[in-house]
């Protein structure tokens, strides 16, 4: 099936501008154009955009996504892409775990300070 950019945008929940931007950044390769220059997208582009959205939710940057696209473009197989994706996901998971530890410490500090302030308030009465 083929889609014009507006149809594709509606289907994947992105703006037309975002789709064009991803194309400019090289995340959408080989987009076909009609004689008038109008872009035409396929189901492969739908899958690619959903994959990009998933990677974005998981915390990957556009530069990291471009790196994966470059690997795929160079080798035309996922054999090199998937191990690198696992490395990136592992790194992001470590970052999330560090942030969770920091947030847990902050939560404990807020709780302790709130108790301190509550005691001071009770003493003042």
Residue ranges and their predicted role:
Residues 36-43:
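Minor-groove-contacting beta-hairpin "wing" of winged helix-turn-helix DNA-binding domains
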Residues 29-36:
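Beta-hairpin "wing" of winged helix-turn-helix
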Residues 17, 39, 86-87:
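Generic secretory/membrane-interface signal
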